[in-house]
């Protein structure tokens, strides 16, 4: 087999939970906790994971914003785990799905993205 392997540390204290944080224009616009089902340790909503609104710590919020900035992303879905060592960066999504986050938070994330795109296009930041 000629392919790469990615190994990832298992964070037991996360208990199959993670945080999805939507960053738009260097600010957090919405966040939710995703929880896995008994059948699957992954918390993805499209795999049946449950969601609830969550209050982020200042460290979680700044970590999400910094991750998006570091990768040059104006829109990003940042996934964090809560651990005994503090928040851990799990994944950065450059094209995050909206499934679940608007319903659980009551925030129109799509509108926030559109406003961000309009503002940056108007200011010629993409030309």
What residue spans do the PLM features occupy?
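Phosphate-binding site of ATP-dependent enzymes
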Residues: 1-71
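C-terminal active-site "lid" helix and adjoining low-complexity regulatory extension at the edge
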Residues: 55, 69, 82-127
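Protein kinase-like catalytic core scaffold
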Residues: 6, 29-30, 76, 88-90
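Hydrophobic residue at the +6 position relative to the catalytic HRD Asp in the kinase catalytic loop
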Residues: 78-80
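Active-site lining segments that contact anionic ligands and/or coordinate catalytic metals
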Residues: 16-18, 75, 87
